[in-house]
Amino acid sequence: MKNYFSLIILISALFAQNVVTESDSLNPISLEGVEVFSSLRQVNEGDLAASAVIFNDELKIMEGQHFSDLLLRVPNLNYAGGSSRPRYFQIRGEGSVSRYADQGPPSPYVGLVLDGMDLSELGMITPLFDMQQVEVLMGVQTSLFGASASSGLINFKTNDPTDEEGGYFMTQFGSYNTYTTGLVYNLPFENGWKLRLVGHSNVSDGYKENVALGNNYSSADKNETSLRAKILKEGDLITQKYTMIYSDFDNGYDNWAPDNNTDNITYSDNPGKDSQESKIFIADYKYDLGEQIVDFNVGISNNETLHSYDSDWGNYDFWVNWEGDDHHDDHGDDHGDDHGDDHDGDDHDDDHGDDDHDDEDHDDFDFQSYDFFDSFERDIDTRTVDLRFRSNTNNNNRVDYVFGIFQSNYEETTDAAGYVFGGSATGLATGYDIISKSFYGELAYNFDNESTLAVGFRREARDIDYFDFDNTGSDFVLDGDWNTSFKVSYEMHPTSNLHWYIYAAEGYHPAGVNQNPYLDMEDKTYDDEIYTDVTTGIRWYTDNIKLSASLFYLEHDGHIFEAVEQLDPQNPNAFAFFKQNADSGYEYGTETNGEFRFSDKLSMGLSLGYMSSEIHFGDHDDHGDEHGDDHDDHGDDHDDHGDDHDGDDHGDDHDDHGDDHDDHDDHGDDHDDHDGHEGHADHGQ
């Protein structure tokens, strides 16, 4: 755990005026003044017909931190830990957990948007410094944002320029040589233009000790820089806003250890990197035509990412001495029950055969060759265009409407080195061109000032072109079908401080083609997954209490899950990913979130999530049989490789290491399910 000391210095235009005053009175909680930026229509939090958690005022005291520090405050929101900062999110148990070089095209379940720019699976560049609002919407949001939000949406809104000149400087010190700084300056001009400049830096050694590199604490360091310039001009007819963002997160990556990081110690002799450099430009135009408003948004981004890691998790000396190491004893204890079950209750030594045979096998193994490293780089260019027509809600219309068209172009090239396609290749050079196009709308009827019925829809198609630059003959073109999503909602205010809503939504996650050219033909494709979401909830608030609670039920038809086959038990990198469809599934649960404010300086938060889920595989139960029981054997043969190695000590000894790779539920305790080496449901964590 890191300890922090913070210092904030306010900068006024005259450098002599006191620009901040505080009142001892308690500022009342209000939902009506909190605009929800991720909604199609302009609504406040108190009128939102969705299960959501919205952060705004509390972000002011978290400016030195990252979005990952908010995650525990959102019920039923999780993330996969296989990166230096969260990239892959799950909401209500549905979401992506990884995307290695050979895992196919991007297919996020939880959309992530920064100032109108889609950064799904690229969201590690989201520090909370100078952030106006963070919105997390739970459940199916495909009518709002398309297939990228089939499980939910995370929306970030940074502060706009203001009319007052001034700014502030923030610095924060912490343990492990953590040093964070931030600078904001706001500058209005006489011609009506306003400029806001923001800079933020965070450096830290990390908190893991690498004993192979001389007790080094910097193998998982963080070097993060974010720069932002925002220009705004508001007119009676046209409002223009331009946002330019540069982020460079150059972080080390040294997370995995055979003992599950029991003491935050790693043994890798070749630590990796987890970095992302992003350049983003966003142009927003708002045309106020009186009865109607026209919004036009254009976004362009370039993102260069690198993910690499020491995939044997150790070093030569570590593996040579692994048999007698204390960590091995602990590891044996951890898995003793499994070995005992597999070997009729014999003790751990008996499970691995006699000592002579163990020593012989141990001596024969070439530890010098047990050295693996994986790396993949991506260059990602995105372009988005969104044109939206909506009624002016300031006119208190009986009927409000929104209609729009949207298109995104996603271009990616990937260069990978290591064991690719389950060890069938040592390198990979590929590319994707993905075009998503949609038209959408929402119609809302306001019965009175207290209740609204709304119907929303979206028609969307996604076309994928895949290029294999190594000419393996695995190029493909997928012309996606048009899919329809809809949402019907009703919300009302039974009393002045109570809000109730209910909605039914249907969405989808798109079909695709598995990238691995060595898969059997029956495993090359998978179909759309259809979602049906029914949610009801309440919001209750007083001057010092805000409480929300919801109940949800979600059904899946053609549930997409990701299978993994470990092809070589002696090589922790020899695994192959592919997606398939289960028959159906469902989940239900509840989400509760609250804030209890005792004073302007003291408050208490509440976050409670509960979920139960079930997947029916039907005809897919024989999937393991079709693949020689490889997938099912992740729970048997690869947990105890006795069948493959006849009880040899190294067969089991290093299969214990393989067990760590194959069964990352243990790693999941520390890292929210590392995704690289286990058989798992893609979004059923």
State each model region's role.
Residues 446-453, 461, 553, 580-630, ...:
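Gram-negative outer-membrane beta-barrel transporters
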Residues 166-168, 173-204, 208-252, 277-283, ...:
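Transmembrane beta-barrel wall of Gram-negative outer-membrane proteins
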Residues 31-62, 87-90, 110:
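N-terminal periplasmic "start-of-domain" segments of outer-membrane beta-barrel proteins
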Residues 101-140:
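Short acidic/polar hinge/loop motifs at secondary-structure boundaries
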Residues 33, 70, 88-90, 133-136, ...:
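N-terminal periplasmic accessory domains that precede
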Residues 284-288, 293-311, 493, 499-505, ...:
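Membrane-embedded beta-barrel scaffold of Gram-negative outer-membrane proteins
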Residues 68, 72-117:
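Extracytoplasmic beta-strand/coil segments of soluble accessory domains associated
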Residues 231-237, 389-392, 398-408, 430-556, ...:
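Structural signature of Gram-negative outer-membrane beta-barrels, strongest in the C-terminal barrel
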